[in-house]
Amino acid sequence: SEENAFFQISPVSESYLNYFNDINHDFSYVRDYMKRINSYLISEYHIDGFRFDLTKGFTNKNIAENYVSSRVDYLKMIANDIRDVDEDNYIIFEHFQGFEEKIFSDYGILTWGEENYNYNEATMGYASDLSGISYKKRGFKNPTLIGFMESHDKERLMYKNLEYGNSSGSYDIKHFDNAMGRMEAAGAFFFTVPGPKMIWQFGELGYNISINQCPDGSISEDCRVSNKQSAFQLDMDKGIK
């Protein structure tokens, strides 16, 4: 209802940052609620880390892309509350706001480092800049950037290799073996860069089922959350060298 102090019927911050009703992050009871939930998960279930989704939306300000000092202070407070329970707990923010990410890095907080487009351009055989995977490129002093090539939000590299891969003479990236070779090469320019990395499920096997594949095999964004066969159901693990 409109009287609910915890949830706002109409999100205050920018609409693309909100899904369903928006939590009123400025309300003191909400902040205490967050503190108690995180503390309980650590003490009761021994959770060793948290990844907070879309932390850029942890504000009632309608200027999410700008620097918001109150948001930074609030997120630091969440980190402090977690560390009061377990000082070694992993804290990850999916934030995507460059200046604030530098502040969080200096504070020992890990941040999400998406490089799907650039790596996929490279694996498909097109010119690309992979330097964004480096924490130094983003101006961080500490290796707190969790780099990734694929995620639950992004298309599979191998799928696009096979669909849109470049070619030169007899060499065609749409050929499966060549496409897999490109994935191996991408790994060499991914894992060797200092800093933590995230491998999205089955990415290490060259999983090539589109994120948008429908149960009937067609491709549509309406099927983004449709069930997909696992790599084990498809025997992809049988080809590991």
Spell out what each predicted region is.
Residues 43-48, 54-155, 162-164, 179-181, ...:
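Active-site-proximal helices and loops of the catalytic beta/alpha 8
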Residues 1-46, 54-66, 77-86:
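Substrate-binding/active-site clefts of carbohydrate-active enzymes
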Residues 15-17, 141, 175, 197:
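Short, functionally important structural connectors and interaction interfaces within domains
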Residues 169-179:
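Metal-dependent phosphoester/phosphodiester hydrolase catalytic core
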